[in-house]
Amino acid sequence: MVDESNAGPVAPAVVADAEVKAPTGKKRSSSRPQKAPPEPAQPKMPAAKRRGYSEQERSEKLRLIETKVSEGNTLKDAIKSAGISEQTYYHWKGAAKSAAREDIERTRPLSAGDEFAELVQLEEENQRLRKQLAEKLRTENTELRKRLGLD
């Protein structure tokens, strides 16, 4: 029979398994080429300088766009011919609309005050005319009584 107490050949098998099961780190391939360092990006075209338009120029461009649209051009073409972007057009249009509302609101209290003053004046004139009418009716009544001999 074989002697089982001899563990000589079994030990290397366990050691071999231990080496196989040992965690191995991620191996890097040295054959992959290195990336070139990034070059500084150069702008293709210089950015367009932002241009500020005065209120008068804005309103003129908005009127120009409105006339072109009324002539039959598309809104997009009219905006392009005015030399502004669609976003700018809508921004200016909204600002013009809100400015018009503010103007109306500012003039309302003035016109309301004028209307109130006119109303007061009309009421005074109405009172004066009523007094004149009452006086005229009294004088006519007294004359009629004298003619009829009722006094």
Swiss-Prot record:
Top-level taxonomic group: Bacteria
GO BP terms, alphabetized: DNA transposition
Keyword Transcription regulation: yes
Disulfide bond residue pairs: none
Residue span of region Disordered: 1-65
Entry keyword set: Nodulation, Plasmid, Repressor, Transcription, Transcription regulation
Taxonomic lineage: Bacteria, Pseudomonadati, Pseudomonadota, Alphaproteobacteria, Hyphomicrobiales
Organism in which the protein naturally occurs: Rhizobium meliloti (strain 1021)
InterPro entries found in the cross-reference section: Homeodomain-like_sf (IPR009057), Transposase_8 (IPR002514)
Basic and acidic residues bias (residue ranges): 52-65
Family: Belongs to the SyrB family.
Name of this chain's protein: Probable transcriptional regulator syrB3
Ranges annotated as spanning the membrane: none
Biased composition (Low complexity): 7-23
Molecular function in Gene Ontology: DNA binding; transposase activity
